[in-house]
Amino acid sequence: HFRFTITTNGVLLNDEIQEFVNKEMDNVVLSLDGRKEINDQMRPFRNGTGSYDLIVPKFQKLAESRNQEKYYIRGTFTRNNLDFSNDIMHFADLGFKQMSIEPVVGDESDPYAIREEDIPKIMEEYDKLAKMMIEREKEGKGFNFFHFMIDLNGGPCVAKRLSGSGSGTEYLA
């Protein structure tokens, strides 16, 4: 059995595509860089306007159509949003239950690039996020954060350790 995942920025997502995705894709990655000001700064259209207002309702509809399962809102944190725990909380406030956020990869000369001196702040944000998640869980508003979902019995990368990597056993590009 092959598992298929698709990643989308949501711009062209419509009812027909959503139906296809729900029928054919095991998982969907919905790319949203963060809060409105963060996303729109990093993902403007050619005319300079942001994509946030267009894509968020589409993503909410898709997440609901999948019963809040088998998808991830996937954000990116940069030097512009080292307070990325606020982006995750924003996603939760929008009703999303499956989330991930990754550090940007870029040349160190890029103004948004993460620098070595940012690492302590990033570590603080992960601690802050863990505490916020505990509070949300107590309030009955819990959600999953991909990078905190570790198999304590098998470790995070058993398949990769056994095969040398996830390539060919977990994913193809």
Spell out what each predicted region is.
Residues 28-29, 56-59:
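A conserved non-catalytic segment of reverse transcriptases
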Residues 37, 42-53, 60, 64-173:
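Radical SAM enzyme [4Fe-4S]-AdoMet core and its adjacent flexible, acidic
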